[in-house]
Regions:
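Bacterial N-terminal signal peptides
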Residues: 19-29
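Active-site-proximal alpha-helix that buttresses catalytic centers in soluble enzyme cores
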Residues: 40-141, 153-155, 159-194
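Sec/Tat signal peptide C-region and signal peptidase I cleavage site
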Residues: 32-36
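Periplasmic-binding protein-like
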Residues: 143-147
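N-terminal export leaders
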Residues: 10-21
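Secretory targeting signals
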Residues: 2-7
Length: 194
């Protein structure tokens, strides 16, 4: 397949994003292929983002702001060529609306896995929830997108085996984490900005 970037008139920023999103997982996986072969594990690249900018109301389940809708469309452009076959969201409309442009573009139905809190500590995520999302994202190898929340994305990176566990504040919406899982519980993490 020949790609003519000049005829498509991609601007320099879009071209750089395309190169990073498409080539970074290959670079990260290159050093991990041997470990994956030894463990009979399919290398998986998982893209994690926090939902896009949300409205203030209704507080329980707000929709996206116009800026959030634009960010969701930009995410679809950025990850449109990343060969994503699995998309996972929470039950909240802000995550579904963030994933929707990419899901529509790829013809992929997003899987909704409701966020569950620990029965032991209401401030912690349920270990079963984290395991279910990580297992679903890595089930078939390939590439996956998880759209989460400021409190779920760091914990999901950890559940996937990542050693970089960022803190995401409530005003930050432009983080894109690329987690290359090369063995059960072992991964490399790259932190990009959308």
């Amino acid at each position: 397949m020949k790609i003519d970037f000049y005829s498509q008139r991609l601007n320099r920023t879009a071209f750089i994003k395309w190169i990073v999103v498409c080539c970074l997982p290959l670079f990260l996986a290159w050093g991990s292929a041997r470990a994956a072969a030894q463990n009979d594990f399919k290398v998986t690249t998982v893209y994690l983002v926090r939902h896009a900018e949300k409205a203030a109301a209704p507080a329980a389940d707000p929709p996206l702001l116009e800026a959030g809708t634009k960010r969701a469309e930009e995410l679809a452009r950025t990850l449109g060529k990343a060969r994503i076959t699995t998309i996972i969201t929470s039950q909240y409309q802000r995550t579904k609306l963030t994933a929707e442009p990419l899901a529509r573009q790829l013809g992929v139905t997003a899987t909704v896995i409701p966020v569950a809190m620990s029965t032991m500590n209401a401030r912690e995520l349920s270990p079963q929830y984290l395991k279910e999302v990580a297992d679903r994202a890595t089930a078939n190898g390939g590439n996956a997108l998880i759209v989460g929340h400021s409190n779920t994305v760091p914990e999901l990176i950890k559940a996937l085996g990542g050693d970089i566990v960022p803190t995401i504040d409530d005003a930050t919406y432009d983080d894109l984490f690329v987690v290359t899982v090369y063995a059960k519980g072992k991964a490399k993490v790259a932190h990009l900005k959308q």
